[in-house]
């Protein structure tokens, strides 16, 4: 089953009949319009390409304009591709709504996490700070040793050090689907998802469900 492209609206909570509070993220999934269908003969694999939302006419490039015109759909803010499994068929110009998640229990949500800029090891990797006193005057939040000796004589790749934190692709798996509101194009999932309010999200049925 394919996924859909949505937009993070924010977080709220809903109550069960027993009065239990469930934190939920509201994802707005407007109709995804099919712009291209790829097949084995021409592309070597089966996939469907979709767009959603709108884009100002003066922001659409000529190649994009031609691509959308060929598909006969309105220009959207993004293009995303989903692999097709056996038996799944879509046609160019078709609209796919949030209703495809009506019978789905869990989803995987992918987004771009909030960027935190250049961060030290304490914030980025949860390193312990060193002594505040007892003779320590300069090295309170420094990482400490980053290597060994003349052998190996280098810092190993992947060493946890200070650097860019956030602003990377993150997937949160197996979030419970709490509600599907087809009338308002909303999907409510339990818990938090990556990214800032208003950012694009990719929602797929959970691979581990």
Swiss-Prot record:
Free-text description of this protein's post-translational modifications in UniProt: Methylated by PrmB.
Record GO terms (molecular function): rRNA binding; structural constituent of ribosome
Region (Disordered): 133-153
Record-listed N5-methylglutamine modification sites: 150
InterPro entries from the UniProt entry: Ribosomal_uL3, Ribosomal_uL3_bac/org-type, Ribosomal_uL3_CS, Transl_B-barrel_sf
GO CC terms: cytosolic large ribosomal subunit
Origin: domain of life: Bacteria
PANTHER family listed in its UniProt record: 50S RIBOSOMAL PROTEIN L3 (PTHR11229), LARGE RIBOSOMAL SUBUNIT PROTEIN UL3C (PTHR11229:SF16)
SUBUNIT field: Part of the 50S ribosomal subunit. Forms a cluster with proteins L14 and L19.
The protein's name in its UniProt record: Large ribosomal subunit protein uL3
Organism: Pectobacterium carotovorum subsp. carotovorum (strain PC1)
Gene that encodes it: rplC
